[in-house]
Structure formats: C-alpha cells, structure tokens
Amino acid sequence: MSARNTNSRKDVIVVGAGPVGLSAALALRSCGLEVTVLEADPANRVRPGSRALFVHRESLALLDRASPGLAPAIAGFGVMWRTKRTLLGGREVYARTYPELPPGRIPPFTSLRQLDTERFLLEAAKVAGADFVWGARVTAVEAGPDEVLLTTEDGATHRACYVVAADGSRSTVRRSLGIAMNGPRSEGFHTTVDIAEDPDDPMPLERTFHYEHPGLGWRHVMRVPFAGGFQIDVQSADGDRPEEFATEEAVRDWLPRVVPRKYVDSVTCVANYRFLQVVAESFADDSRRVLLAGEAAHLFPPLGARGMNSGIADADAAANAIALALSAADPRQAGAAVERFDATRRAAAEANRDAAGTALAHLRPRRRITRLRQRAAAALSPVVPAFGEWLEQATYGPKTPRPHAGRY
C-alpha cells in the first residue's frame, strides 16, 4: 500500500452517512467492531425533500436487532395508513382498510421523511459508539490484500481492514474501483411534490393510486401520507417536459386539480426524476475488502419501496460478513465470507430490480393491449373484486421473498 498512511488502521470505515451508511454503522457496532463513518457533507447539512418514505417491518426488525428500541421509536414517529384505495379514470376499483395493530407489535411499515429516519439512525449510531468525520469527501480508494486506503478531499488519509461503500448513486468508491453498473434507464419522468398537512383539517390518512386521473390529462397520480404531510407523485405522459410539471408555477397550476386548493401554499419541495434499473456487476472489489451497499450498488424504481429497505438489508449483511471475515482463521475463509455477501445481495438486488421493472412496465405499457386490460379489469372490478386487487397490487410489482436474503 501507499506510504501516505497517516492514521491508525480501523476495523471498518463506512463511506456515507445516509440511511444505509448509518444502518451499517449500527450493525457493525452491534457486532463489537470499531467503525468510523466518513461523510462528504457537513454535520449541519440540510436534506431537501422527503426522499425515501417507507421503512418496512423487516428493516425495522434489523435496526432493532442492532439497536434495541429503535424500531418502536421510528415507527412511533412515522405514520401507518390503514386504508389503501385505487381508482381508474375517476372511479374507485379497489379499497381496503386494515384493522388496528395490537399494542407493542412492529407495524408492516411506517412512513416518514428520510431525513427523519436519518435523525433516529444518527442518534442511535452515536450512542452505540460510532465515530463520525464530517466534511470528509472521499476522492480516491486503494484496496489491497490487507487493507484499504481512503483519501479525502482535504488530503487526509484513512486506513481500514474493510470498507462499506454507502456513498450513493454517484459512489466515488465504486467508480474508483472500476465496478460498473448495468441495466436500462426508463422512459419518461415522474414529478414529486411534498406537501405539509393541515393539522386542523387534514386529508384522510390513506394511500391512493389513481390510474388515468381525469383532472390531470389521464396521467397516473399517487398520494402517499408521511409524518407531517403527504407526497403527490405524477407520472409523465409521452411528450411531457419537466418544466411543465416540476416548477413552482407549474405546480400551482396543476396541484388544485388533484388535491384541495389550500395545499398550493403548503408545498415544501418539488422534484422530478427518471427511473434507473441498474445493479453493480459486483458488490465487492477484487481484494474482497470493499463491500457496496444501497444506491452505491443498485438503483431501481421506488415502486414497492425497495430502495432504502434493500439498502438496510445490504448494510446488515455487509456488517455480518465483515465480522465473520475479521474473525476468520485464514484469508481464504475471510474472502469466502465477503463472496457470500456479494452473491446473496447481488441476487437480491437483481430480483428487486426485476420486480420493480415489472411494476414499471405495468404503469408505462408499451403495448395498447396492456392499457385495455387495465381498463377491462376496472370495469369488471365491481363484480369480480380480484380484478381490482390486481390493479392495486400490480403497482408494487411481484412479492417474491428470497429464503436466504429476506424480502429485500
């Protein structure tokens, strides 16, 4: 390795203090390992928008295992809507209301802004003893047979036995290692609008998906509640331009067609994005010292809320693999632990990508017959409820639990 090493070697360095990096830090500390988190942003960073909303039950269970009490804290802050409703062309085709959960049980999910999830994770990681270096943007990575050397923008170097790369979709770590991302980019774009709820006169706590909304030119529109507000997601039509939907002026024009006009003055964030369906060709480097997690390893449509939840599963699996590697009797066993992580989590990511891609193909059909089937299902749903349920479930993609990798 380079002679530029200036710091004592750590067990593990996590690059990135988003939800995946923080989850990795928690899991590593629960394994008894020292961990330092390098984050490019300053400690007082402000994160725009709601970003990832849903923390699912399996993720809550993983977090609670690493930090007992964390699951009820996050779930208690977030909201769980009990009613989901699906419409097509202005007519309801499916609705279901779930019973109240028994006290003390982890909910199927909780909905809150990513910045709120991160706040809980950061506090738990600090209490657990993770060290943080803020304003430490990684610019170079050297991985060798015995350690990894990271160089940050200020010229400082950091050495570790293992590194978890959780530095997001533009991962410097992944790019430095030459690991490619493979997969397609979807057509069109989506516009999301975060809105603060009116505490005196709130909308029903329901998730609604509206195929072909008549008030918005027959575009698909979804409303998802989160703690303190809700998000509107609009799917673009062919020929749409982002400036027609994702500017302040545009939102003020179209938003009253889908929610009461009073919410025009309660918009907190507007964004537009395109869907990628890509997975890293490997979740570990050739030396088996760097493990990729979260968006550093995969990007796919958020249909089914697979993004952050799969990243939390990556983080937990990476921590377990590193703990096994550090306690291994010889380098071959250590490498095998990382290889198992690579194979298992890459297979999970590919399954998630395919499931989200199936949902996206349903929502953006290339063949007219698919749209006709959806409309026929809507017409028949009053007499055959299964058709309405199909329209509801298809927006998430298939649920295919993997016995060795969990749901995500």
Locations of regions flagged by a protein language model:
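Conserved FAD-binding catalytic core of PHBH/FMO-like flavoproteins
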Residues: 123, 162, 166-273
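A conserved short coil-to-beta-strand element within the FAD-binding core of flavoproteins
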Residues: 134-148
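Glycine-rich FAD pyrophosphate-binding loop
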Residues: 29-51
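N-terminal Rossmann-like FAD-binding beta1-loop-alpha1 element of flavoenzymes
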Residues: 10-37
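Core beta-strand elements of the Rossmann-like FAD/NAD(P) dinucleotide-binding domain
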Residues: 10, 153-162
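C-terminal helical "tail/cap" subdomain of flavin- and related membrane-associated enzymes
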Residues: 5-6, 321-408
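Conserved mid-domain beta->alpha element of the FAD-binding
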Residues: 19-27, 121, 165, 267, ...
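Active-site-adjacent segment of FAD-dependent monooxygenases/related oxidoreductases
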Residues: 47-52, 56-124
